Amino acid sequence: MTKKILIVDDEVHIKMLLEQTLEELEDEFDVELLTASDGEEGLAIIRNDHPDLVFLDIMMPKMNGYEVCRIVMEDEQYDGIKIILLTAKGQEVDRKQGLEMGAKMYMTKPFDPDEILKVSKDLLELEA
C-alpha cells in the first residue's frame, strides 16, 4: 500500500531537502511525496489526497501551520493523518501549542535528516 507524505513549506530549499531525505524511505515503503508551498495549498492536498504523514511548517503565507493542524485534527474525516510540525520557532510555548493541537512531533530547523527518517519510519509503521 502506498504511503503518501505531504511536505508543506514556503521555503523551496527546505522542501527539496525533505524530499531528498524522504526518498530514502522507498527502500522500505512504497512512498508518494506531495508538496505544497503554503497552508491553503497544503490543506487542499490534504482534503483531496488524505496523506498518511504531513510535514508542516508553522510560519507560512495565506494560512499558518497551526491553523492547518487545527483544522485537520478537529475533523474526523482526517483521522489517522499524522502531523510533524517543522519550524524555526524553538521556544517551549510554541512546541507545547503544536503538540496540544494534536501534532505527533515538533521539530526545529535546521533538522537532522537521520531524525526525519527515523520519525517517519516509526509513524508510518504504526499504520501497518
Place the predicted regions along the sequence by residue:
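Alpha4 helix (beta4-alpha4-beta5 surface) of REC/receiver domains from two-component response regulators
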Residues: E67, G90-M105, L117-K121
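Short amphipathic alpha-helix used as the core "switch/output" element in two-component signaling
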Residues: A44, Y66-D79
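A Lys-centered signature of the CheY-like receiver
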Residues: K109
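Helix N-cap/capping motif at the beta->alpha junctions
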Residues: T35-A44, G65
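Receiver (REC) domain active-site loop signature in two-component systems and cognate sites
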Residues: M60
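Two-component/phosphorelay signaling modules centered on CheY-like receiver
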Residues: V12-L34
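Active-site beta3 strand of CheY-like receiver
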Residues: D49-F55
